[in-house]
Amino acid sequence: EVFDIETTGFSPVNNRIIEIGAVKVSGGEIVDRFSTFVNPDVPIPFEIEKLTSIRDEDVMDSPQIDVILPQFLQFCEGCIMVAHNASFDMSFIMENCRRLGYPQEFTYVDTVGISRVLLKNQSKHTLDAVAKTLGISLENHHRAVDDAECTAHIFVKFIKMLEEQDLSLIHI
């Protein structure tokens, strides 16, 4: 299960999730999607609105995280979670799990770490830079489900590259 979140800032303690997007991958294909806005109950900062194009009006009528998180966790149940720069996304998921009393035990993979191993000569390992290097389309960057879908395609390509090099994720 590959996922991405958009937030009101960089601190999982002080900032809020405003969008969660996720896709399930099976046999190298996307087989299911989860996408929702989250009402952060605080105004979205201007810089975040500029980056994501998500406005207060977009999230105003959406459920808050206490409703969305259990749905997201159910979507992820039994899956290894994959994200680009996973420590950021996971810190928000784990903080919200802590706040709402959900278990915080997750198995996750970070495509940035794999990128640093497989694309050694690349100077930037941002989602858009890696996508460009691998020839993967990234539409609506900084929208959660689109970033998750792009990350899924990157992850599938990385798995193929690892198999070709006779490596596995265990060695990374």
Regions found by a protein language model. Give the residues of each.
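A short, structured active-site edge motif that brings together acidic residues
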Residues: F106-S115
